[in-house]
């Protein structure tokens, strides 16, 4: 069976992601605002060109659009940057969760993955609590939704490895970003955060396209 997520789109995504990662150490706003979302735009174009059903296509595009909005918001220098960024990515995760639940098939064996993920996220959240201030509630809500997204990714009935790997990369990216943003503030960490983020978005998009082109 041929899947309609095209190789040219994948290569353009890879090229633009590498360009951004390589340039990240020496570019600043507004260049970051322009370059950062381009790989996600490539994924949106790729999804538009697929043969997915209208409902699956709309949900996946919405997940990517809100991710793109979050990418842009987090590069803009204004006071509500973090709050709006969290809101955008929270909505993106909700659309991903909806897609996962539409193809839900409970697998008891995958429950063994939940405990280490839960402990890891719990430890990260506990570590950050003293540093969050007014963002405590939004960040904790976001963490809960992120964890639900990861857990539900493990229960899709097909393409489970690709989709769950994408969800785990998203978790790693978000936790690294949060720890660095609120505690460590090391500039070099941005490259790792964006690398894992781009890998996550590609795996989630590619996996979901394959899943729903197989009939969900």
From Swiss-Prot:
It is a multi-pass membrane protein. Optimum pH is 6.5-7.0. The keyword Cell inner membrane applies. Keywords: Cell inner membrane, Cell membrane, Hydrolase, Lipid metabolism, Membrane, Transmembrane, Transmembrane helix. Its main location: membrane. Pfam families: YhhN. It is found in: Cell inner membrane. InterPro entries: TMEM86B-like. It is an enzyme of class 3 (hydrolase). The keyword Transmembrane applies. It comes from the Bacteria. Competitively inhibited by lysophosphatidic acid. Its EC number is 3.3.2.2. It catalyses: a 1-O-(1Z-alkenyl)-sn-glycero-3-phosphocholine + H2O = a 2,3-saturated aldehyde + sn-glycerol 3-phosphocholine; a 1-O-(1Z-alkenyl)-sn-glycero-3-phosphoethanolamine + H2O = a 2,3-saturated aldehyde + sn-glycero-3-phosphoethanolamine. GO terms for biological process: lipid metabolic process. Specifically hydrolyzes the vinyl ether bond of lysoplasmenylcholine (pLPC) and lysoplasmenylethanolamine (pLPE) to release a fatty aldehyde and glycerophospho-choline or glycerophospho-ethanolamine. Has no activity on diradyl plasmalogen, 1-alkenyl-glycerol, and monoacylglycerophospho-ethanolamine or monoacylglycerophospho-choline. May serve to protect the bacterium from lysis by lysoplasmalogen derived from plasmalogens of the host. This is Lysoplasmalogenase.
